[in-house]
Amino acid sequence: DPGAERDGVTEKDLMLSFALSLRDFLVRDGIDVVMTRDSDVFVALENRVAFAHQAEGNLFISLHADVLQQGGAKGATVYTLSDEASDTATEHLAARHNRSDIIAGADLTGSDDQVAGILLDLARQETEPRSVAAAKALTAGMKAAGGPMNRHPIRNAGFSVLKSADIPSVLIEIGFLSSERDLSNLRDPIWRAVMVSAIADSIAKWRDTDAALKPLIRQ
């Protein structure tokens, strides 16, 4: 699955290169990084989330550069899971075969759907503000580095890959291949390096702030 394609540029190759560079920056900042893929392979959505749980991740980031023909989408955008999608996600993710992967390894076998839903809601009460804080840190960092940003740089959507209840999760659209401006930027190694550095710095800042605020969120 090559993802989006435009003028010979494929999303899968572009984002893999971007992710590998971001990993190197983060490692230099003393941050442990686990990649869902580090080569040209396809990883199912549910397996990406499972990798994050197995690694006991503190932040899950999904990188994209899509093609949207309608609306003239352009500029970097960071998504968190929407309230509407969260309700739907709870309904589907509370299914028995997924429960052990959803709530920090907790075994919900024998729990009814109502109990599972309550546990998911409790997990999201802690995770949602942390995801939003990560989105704010990322958009601020990318904007300060020159962006360019979408008119509404923080949005909510029901992306399946963001449905983990217990790990702060964001999806970053670095830009849109359907935008001539974004495509030009995404092809530019200097621009990509600037954005990689900005995102890495933003993650490091979020990590430090999150460590201080997490105990307060749990109260």
Stretches found by the model and what they are:
Residues P2-G3:
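Gly-rich Lys/Arg/Thr-decorated short loops/hinges at beta-loop-alpha junctions or inter-strand turns
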Residues R6-Q219:
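Active-site-proximal helix/loop segments of hydrolytic enzymes
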